[in-house]
Amino acid sequence: RWLLRDIEDRRDAMLTLYTEIGKTPLDFSVKVDVKSSNEEIATIIRNILELNATTQKSFRTPEKALSYCVTTLEKSDVLVFQAAKIDPSEMRGLSVAYEQMPIIVLNRKDEPSARLFTLCHELVHIVTRTSGICTDTAENSMSLNELELRCNQIAGMVLVPKSSIIKHPSIRDIQTYGFDDLYVNKIAHDFAVSKQVIIHCLWELNIISKQFYFETLNRYSEEYKTHQMKKSSKGFLPPVTDTATQVGKLYARTVLNAYYADKITARDTSGYLLNLKAKNFGKLERWGF
């Protein structure tokens, strides 16, 4: 598939450019037996992402949480790209578990909360060395693939540990006064995740029934569809934003560093940056640095 070829080409370019600018790729040494417990794998991934209750509460939005997690991974030379032209029904995420510069691909057409969930899902594949293309990384997944279901469960535990959510005041409110979207919104806000993730946790904690979970999930899905239909079309993204969101800051910085060090030409740089014109390099630099 063309996407696989593109991301492999980007990784090859990164390795070449690191050599050109005198950098050594970091080893991604975290490796976990796939037979380990879900709790153990989730804890390891939270440590990789440097997530804790205080940090998560400071995010307030899935956008900020996603940005933080991607930046944290890029510090370890994990390449995080975003596909721009693929429908989420075809691919939610993709991962390739290299020992150096492992690759995670998210789908830019997904909402930030969905991309955050997918990022955690793909990290499970990376640390257990079970990478591949994932078409069903939603927290409400009905996938029959046992590994994919496990990855979804672990992703939920990474973002919302049971030990943390049971202490949340709104859990007590739900148990005392009954289910209310206001309580769900408050919990989702504090963990910077979607409402869907939270109601899945409520089901797992036996606070709501399976039937009520799916009824609420369907209602949220319909509300989301209505919201999407009301949103005005944003048209085309500016060239810099288009390139930046697809290749990520680590990749963009590396290419520009090589260019400013006279290791590659402007034409080469443009090619590495999805044919971004040289006049836009400065804007990309301000975004990436």
Language model: regions and residue ranges:
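Active-site hotspot residues in diverse enzymes, especially metal/ion-binding acidic/histidine motifs
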Residues: 1-289
